[in-house]
Amino acid sequence: MSDDEAGAPARSGAKAVLVTLAMAQFVMVLDQAVMNVSISQLVEDFDTEVTTIQGVITLYSLVMAALMITGGKLGDRWGRKRAFRIGLIVYACGSALTAVSWSVGALALGWSVLEGVGAALVMPALAALVAGNFQGKARAGAYAVLGGVGGAGIAVGPILGGWVTTNLTWRLVFAGEVVLVLAILVLLRKMQDAPREGAPPELDWVGSALSASGLTLIVLGTLQSGTWGWVQPRNAPVEPFGYSPTLFVIAGGGALLYAFTRWQRHREQLGRDPLVRLDRLRIPALRSGLVMFLAQNTILLGLFFIMPLYLQIVQGYDAFETGLRMLPVSVTMFATSLLGPRFAGRAGPRRVVRVGLVVIVLSCLGLLQVLEPEIDTTAFLVVMGVLGVGMGLIVSQLGNVVQSSVGEEGRSEAGGLQNTALQLGAALGTALIGAVVIGGLASSFLSQVEANPAVSEATQDQVGVELESGISFLSEPQAQAAVDAAGLPPAEGEALLESYADAQLDALKGGVLLAGALALVSFVGTTNLPGREREDDDAGAPVDGAGGPRPAFT
């Protein structure tokens, strides 16, 4: 067979198949980008607080992280096309509920839970369906197209979501997703299923429950740490032994994950299919690749939670203006991810990833300089662009590292672990860095009020009491309304507003500092990434679907 024949599409409807898969990829990527630039509008529409929307965003990523591997196993058992179809139907139901959501609870059920479950079925099946419908060069080209569509979704998402949110309503984005999913379902009949090798795997429901519960407790404890406190209790529902429940909840999650690993080994000893073959995690390159995927998305999604708070709440920009100012991250990340594979051949993935981490640290240092009461728009855009370069360098390497570290039979499982690491990073980024911002806001505000001679002792005491029940990230008009409602003298009210504004910037900078610190610590995780020698030997050409740009949100 000639190269041309080997690269030919599996059937005459290949273009329609590729369009179908590309549409699904775009829908999966679009969601979180829209939510990130709509935070302040969601707070206003549902009359809630930033921390509540933070929880909704975190839950979305957590559901996907907890169910991604199980979703892949269900695809292996049902058939990838059937899992893809069922996932899309569940996703469309979630989008429809989100579009008409009347409360935060409905939003969480529709977006975080139903869309998260649907995505956990769609995403593992999507990559397998490419392999089932394309061969040779056509398959590599299809993966490249999907990578490009995902990158375009990251770039377009903040602009599209911001414009629709500002000029119409964010609900239309999710209504539009329902229409897109219906179109995908119609086109799906032209697609052939991915072939299944061997007998369908046995489902490990106990393992799924243990892993999902463990991850949930760890993320929940991290998310609530800003409210409950890490050690000393602040606004905690319970106080075990007089301490905050945060570490107890996280430790409980760790215990469940330990039980999960024991259960997986037990199933393997019995000759039954485990949810995850733990021996794969002994592969150094795979382990490092997964750790770096986790770190990359923790940093990126944490910063993507911070930036809208600064732009919308501190600066007063609307969602569209916020999307425009965050656009350089997406553009430079996408562009650099296209160029990154070329660098790997010269320097090796390890060095390219380390350079990316250095660039991220530099961008965090730059953010510390530009997060001021009066924004320097040019400087802010430059720093955002630099951040995208660092992220793009990392993203360009890790997909190929993970896929090249296992054989053909292990690529499906490696892909599931990769998506789990990405979504867990997204959940932890929003939870951890968001908790540091909220906790830092309370701590800094109290310190500044106590040090301000214009604030009376009685008011200082009252502020301390109020902070025990939590603090909200308020815009200037909201803060002014709260001060007016308290009936304070004008001079004292002005002093409180000034202290609160300073505390907001201190809290945001604390979150940026944590992101930079995580980038520095992540150098440890690069140790087992392949260097140039290995890249030349066996990873120089990306395996199908492993190279090229990989969206950070998928």
Regions found by a protein language model. Give the residues of each.
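Transmembrane-helix exit segments and adjacent C-terminal regions of multi-pass membrane proteins
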Residues: 1-21, 262-266, 400, 442-443, ...
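Flexible interhelical linker loops that connect adjacent transmembrane helices
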Residues: 8, 185-215, 228-242, 266-284, ...
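Transmembrane core module of solute transporters
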Residues: 14-64, 68, 169, 241-248, ...
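Structural signature of transmembrane alpha-helices in multi-pass secondary transporters
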Residues: 28, 57-60, 64, 91, ...
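Interfacial helix-cap and linker-helix signal at transmembrane-aqueous boundaries
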Residues: 42-43, 74-75, 160-168, 222, ...
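Helix-loop-helix hairpins in multi-pass membrane proteins, especially solute transporters
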Residues: 74-215, 224, 241, 247
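C-terminal module of multi-pass small-molecule transporters
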Residues: 79-88, 97, 102-109, 122-128, ...
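C-terminal membrane-cytosol helix-exit motif in multi-pass small-molecule transporters
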Residues: 178-196, 214-227, 252-268, 522-530
